[in-house]
Structures are given as C-alpha cells and as structure tokens.
Amino acid sequence: RSPSRGLGYVYKRQLWEWSSQGKLPVVIDAASCTHTVVDSMPEMLGESDRERFARLRILDSVKWLRDAAVPHLPITPPRGKIAVHPPCSGAHLGNTEALIELANVCGEAEVPVGTACCGTAGDRVMLHPELVESATREERESLARGHYDHFVSANRTCEMGLEMIAGKPFESIACLLERASRPSQVPL
C-alpha cells in the first residue's frame, strides 16, 4: 500500500478542523480514498493524532447517501434498468449492498455478470488500458447484452476506466440520485 504523500498532512491540518474536532462526519466521495483513509491513516499517525483520528466519523458517500440523504429526498418514479459496478474498495468497506440499494431507489439495479475489480487502480487505466480490458472482459460482454439505461459505480477512477474501455457512460450513484430527486416538471 502506498497512500498519498500528503495524507498525513491533510489529516493533521484539515480533517480535524473541517469536522469541528470530530463533531461533524467526514464524507468521502470515492470508495478507494475512503478505504485508504480508514485503513492506512492510523498507522501513519503518532499516538495523540491516532486518538484524535479515532474520534472522527469517516463515512463513504454510499453509506451516507443511503442512511442520511435518501430518506429526505423526493425520489421520482423509477428511471429504468441500472448497471451497477461495485468497486473492489467499496467491497472492502462493506458498501456493496448499500450501493445496490441506492441504485434500486432509482430504478431496477443489476450487477452485470462478471463484475469484479475493474483493474483501473487509480491512474493505471491511462497508462495500461490493457489491464482494464483484461479485467473487465466478461463484464463488458454482459454490459453489451444488458440493455441498460444507466451505468453507476462509487469511485471516479472505476467510472472513467469502464467508460473508456466499455464505451458506456458510467457515473457516480450520487449523480443518478440527484437527477432522480429533481422535482417533476409539470407540462405547460
């Protein structure tokens, strides 16, 4: 594991302040970043900073959306069939079911056959697209057969890699939820 070099600084100088010394949750909108912060940050910190870190509530956006936002959103009728790509980092966080639940709020969620780690690994899709091509072969075939209306995930690099390799417009589940919660337009 090689966490971002600036992660320790960000924690020490920013997360503590932004969270009002642990009173507000820290919501991270990228499963791989949430996983890194939750899993790697404590070992990078000194004893007093570890104690502070333990008082922070670090939440991935998927669980925050499901538990805190969706109950208050006026969701419009279903928006069709939704291909869901659960990121592997989200699986490590235990977020897969929450991601599927969010997609089901918006329409008919389905995890395509063959969905596993997309192989994007941060910027690797830009440098080695063959990794993603190989890792997603079965998923891409399933996407082509699935007749989906929407394509969602919970990690921007996965979305970018899948869009680039599969040619499907993957986006964050948060974007689909935003559209599904817009007020219905009354025809003139």
Functional labels for PLM-detected ranges:
Residues R1-Y9:
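Positively charged, low-complexity/disordered segments
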Residues G8-L188:
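Iron-sulfur cluster-binding electron-transfer modules in prokaryotic oxidoreductases
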